[in-house]
Amino acid sequence: MTSAAAIPTVTLNDDNTMPVIGLGVGELSDAETEQAVTAALEAGYRLIDTAAAYGNEAAVGRAIAASGVPRDELFVTTKLATEDAGFQSSQDALRASLERLGLDYVDLYLIHWPVSQQGKHVDSWGGLMKSKEVGLTRSIGVANFHGHHLDDIISLSFFTPAVNQIELHPLLNQAELRAVNAEHGIATEAYGPLGVGNLLSHSAVNAIAEAHGRTPAQVLIRWSLQLGNIVIPRSSSPERIRSNIDVFGFELSEEQMSTLNGLDDGTRFRPDPETYSGS
């Protein structure tokens, strides 16, 4: 088990700190969510990532409340659903999320998808700025934003997101977008680091795992951490949750990193932000 104190943190561009690894709970049922968050907090996780669109914020809140972990030790992220896009509606949506979570504030609030064809991502960003100003969230950021989406909000608001959460794994290593994020001082947060499970049986990943006496999942998470990303693997299994955080006792070599970097072929397992208009 990894203690919470042993998990490194990164300082965001607003001077708030964020753990470099956390638990994602997308597509988990309420029961799975409560079990996963409970197991994660017991294992030393302090970053929990949910979203209004996941429908499980209340379950996250129940697990947090039952854990006994002090609020100031936690880092809770949730996200704005597309249907709530807009300046005022984004603020109202965060208040509703907080009520479901049973919290007075979140540590990070993200616009879940740009949905630029809807034309509201800039207005939503203004709403997030207001929510930060009044203390409903400590930090604000975006998810699934490409460079031009970032340019839209930064050029009009003169306020830069702290985080850009994107699909990122060896088949989609997002080198170009990571560089854009870095240029703006935006932390890159990787979701889907295991390729939604599709990379666990990849021969190159397994060879590296065998060389280190580690699991394929641990290798994939370690690869992303060594790239400088924040990583939020999703799991409902307490055993895998404990295993996924045990990634600070080994290091991939330059050759192994290069091997995994070389797998990039642009494969997405989640929607393309350029065309997606969902939640």
From Swiss-Prot:
Q: Where does NADPH bind?
A: 192, 194, 196, 232, 234-235, 240, 243-244, 270
Q: Which residues form the active site?
A: 54
Matching entries from PROSITE patterns are given as: ALDOKETO_REDUCTASE_1, ALDOKETO_REDUCTASE_3
Q: Tell me which UniProt keywords the record has, alphabetically.
A: NADP, Oxidoreductase
Q: What are the annotated disulfide bridges?
A: none
One Gene Ontology term of the molecular function aspect: aldo-keto reductase (NADPH) activity
A single Pfam family it belongs to is: Aldo_ket_red
Annotated InterPro entries: AKR (IPR020471), Aldo/ket_reductase_CS (IPR018170), NADP_OxRdtase_dom (IPR023210), NADP_OxRdtase_dom_sf (IPR036812)
Q: What is its EC number?
A: 1.1.1.-
Superkingdom: Bacteria
Q: What class of enzyme is it?
A: oxidoreductase
The record's annotation in Gene3D superfamilies points to: NADP-dependent oxidoreductase domain
| The family this protein is said to belong to | Belongs to the aldo/keto reductase family.
Q: Mind telling me what this protein is named?
A: Aldo-keto reductase Mflv_4205
